[in-house]
């Protein structure tokens, strides 16, 4: 049997009656969750990577269909939403200067659209227009030009139609976009970890959000990695792996730890660091991405998400926020040790704007109010006005 680290044992043993520990990987989940897990078929399997579609000759042609789908989560059939029937959707890998061509079909029962989160691209024409409507049963074409000077990095795609985006992402509509570095020469093992959360009723349907969750954001009962519960990430002692991590949760902050081991951070979102920076914790807000190097330590470790206060004001007794650590994945390292050659990365190409001249100073007042005590839902305003997609409040020159 592989050794379990002291920190792992403390996590698995210290949660008491409020959590269930199942399987060698240490899956933790709330007893309040009505979705019954059948462990042998679902959790503890090796991490599965999404299918990857790579560009060729400067073009990536891909067809994406958003539709209801039945997937196995924790050994049970779950009725979710998915791109091309997979959770997450296929990974789209492009290079600077490429054109991303997407033939998109909406087979949902609601309006949707597509947003390439993090890409430095235009919203004009058939590109990344978040105000575009693709109604149920309709199809659309996207033509997205990746700038020739686009920095490499990890991004993602998801719906962005106002009023349905959070619900559709929560139900499973998300996938990764990689902008590859044309100068990269390393041969590291790469892992993509798209982390999401979901709540499922006993029927296997996605549970509807409560009033409190709609106001303050909901955190799912189950935390998934590439659509799996507590998968196993394998490696050999001394091996360095590059992990690309996406926080595809709609509200959950991810404060990630790996049994006290260090991460070497390469960059957040599109901001690549000049040199790797050591960190014992990674904090990712919803939509954030991070690229890290992980040196495999022999034995079993647990990648854990520590509860984080995201400012829910203690309303409703804090029911919208998780209060227990969650074992996101197990890292299992065995076999012969390997020596990884030193890895070099190109310097960051991002502009440092901290000393740039300020052309104009603007003051925007963000506020919220209302709620159930006021007889309605929470109202969010900027300069006293609620969001209106047909109104332009600020014009900013590029």
Predicted segment positions?
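A cross-kingdom feature strongest in bacterial/archaeal respiratory oxidoreductases
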Residues: 347-351, 384-386, 393
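Residue-level detector of secondary-structure transition/capping positions
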Residues: 17-18, 23
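C-terminal structured domain segments across diverse proteins
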Residues: 377-387
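C-terminal substrate/ligand-recognition segments
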Residues: 371, 387-398
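Disordered, low-complexity segments in secreted/periplasmic proteins that are enriched in proline
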Residues: 315-316, 372-378
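Terminal connector regions
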Residues: 163-166, 299-330
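N-terminal secretory signal peptides and thylakoid transit peptides that target proteins
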Residues: 1-17
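Histidine-centered copper-binding motifs that mark active-site loops
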Residues: 23-292, 298, 327-343, 356-371
């Amino acid at each position: 049997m592989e050794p379990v680290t002291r920190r792992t044992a403390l996590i698995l043993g210290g949660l008491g009656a409020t959590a269930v520990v199942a399987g060698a990987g240490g899956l933790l989940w709330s007893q309040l969750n009505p979705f019954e897990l059948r462990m042998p078929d679902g959790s503890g399997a090796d991490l599965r990577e999404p299918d990857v579609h790579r560009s060729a000759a400067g073009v990536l042609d891909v067809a994406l269909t958003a539709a209801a789908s039945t997937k196995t989560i924790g050994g049970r059939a779950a009725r979710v939403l998915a791109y091309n029937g997979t959770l997450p959707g296929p990974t789209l890998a492009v290079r600077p200067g490429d054109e991303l061509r997407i033939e998109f079909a909406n087979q949902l029962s609601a309006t949707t659209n597509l947003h390439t989160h993090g890409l430095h691209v235009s919203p004009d024409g058939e590109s990344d227009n978040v105000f575009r409507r693709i109604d149920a049963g309709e199809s659309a074409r996207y033509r997205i030009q990746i700038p020739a000077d686009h920095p490499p990095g990890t991004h993602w795609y998801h719906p962005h139609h106002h009023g349905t985006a959070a619900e559709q992402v929560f139900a499973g509509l998300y996938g990764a976009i990689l902008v590859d570095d044309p100068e990269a020469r390393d041969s590291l093992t790469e892992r993509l970890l798209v982390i999401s959360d979901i709540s499922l009723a006993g029927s296997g349907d996605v549970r509807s959000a409560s009033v409190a969750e709609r106001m303050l954001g909901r955190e799912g009962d189950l935390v998934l990695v590439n659509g799996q519960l507590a998968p196993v990430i394998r490696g050999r002692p001394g091996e360095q792996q590059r992990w690309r991590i996406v926080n595809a949760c709609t509200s959950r902050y991810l404060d990630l730890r790996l049994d006290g081991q260090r991460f070497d951070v390469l960059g957040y979102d599109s901001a690549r660091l000049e040199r790797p920076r050591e960190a014992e914790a990674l904090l990712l807000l919803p939509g954030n991405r991070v690229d890290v190097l992980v040196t495999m330590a022999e034995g079993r470790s647990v990648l854990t998400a520590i509860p984080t206060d995201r400012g829910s004001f203690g309303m409703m007794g804090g029911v919208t926020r998780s209060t227990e650590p969650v074992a996101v994945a197990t890292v299992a390292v065995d076999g012969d040790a390997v020596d990884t050659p030193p890895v070099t990365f190109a310097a960051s190409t991002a502009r440092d704007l901290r000393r740039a001249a300020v052309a104009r100073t603007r003051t925007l007042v963000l506020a919220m109010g209302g709620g159930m005590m006021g007889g309605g839902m929470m109202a969010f305003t900027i300069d006293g006005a609620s969001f209106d997609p047909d109104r332009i409040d600020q014009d900013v020159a590029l």
